[in-house]
């Protein structure tokens, strides 16, 4: 089966079912006549921006959606995987990350400055990132975007 068709089937399954594990997804694919290895399925999941969301102590697969966010999908994945919390203070956003990931996010945000004039710069420590925004409103919007990514 061609990759594009397989990706469409995966989209349909994840959209219409609460999938808790890759094995469950793999089993539902097999029911539809799609045999896929775990490695291929993992690549497909990344390609489709499917993440594990948590709700009431349960983890399940869902699409990383941006809503009205101006944050690109690669950066959204960084936020989802590395950010612990975000809080705006005036025109600043203080982002707590997993240890060692603040500089990764800082570099990714710095790369966005050409397309996002609301981000002026970043300063990163080991687990904290300070984002300097053009205004308090811009900081509040960025914080809301990050929280939306984290909470869905």
From Swiss-Prot:
A GO term for molecular function: DNA binding
Main function: Regulates arginine biosynthesis genes.
Main localization category: cytoplasm
Gene3D superfamilies listed in its UniProt record: 3.30.1360.40, Winged helix-like DNA-binding domain superfamily/Winged helix DNA-binding domain (1.10.10.10)
Gene Ontology biological process terms in this record: L-arginine biosynthetic process; protein complex oligomerization; regulation of arginine biosynthetic process
Record's protein name: Arginine repressor
Family assignment from sequence similarity: Belongs to the ArgR family.
Subcellular localization(s) per the UniProt record: Cytoplasm
Pfam families: Arg_repressor, Arg_repressor_C
NCBIfam families documented for this protein: argR_whole
This protein's UniProt keywords: Amino-acid biosynthesis, Arginine biosynthesis, Cytoplasm, DNA-binding, Repressor, Transcription, Transcription regulation
Assigned GO CC terms: cytoplasm
Origin species: Lactococcus lactis subsp. cremoris (strain MG1363)
Pathways involved: Amino-acid biosynthesis; L-arginine biosynthesis [regulation]
InterPro entries for this protein: Arg_repress (IPR001669), Arg_repress_C (IPR020899), Arg_repress_C_sf (IPR036251), Arg_repress_DNA-bd (IPR020900), WH-like_DNA-bd_sf (IPR036388), WH_DNA-bd_sf (IPR036390)
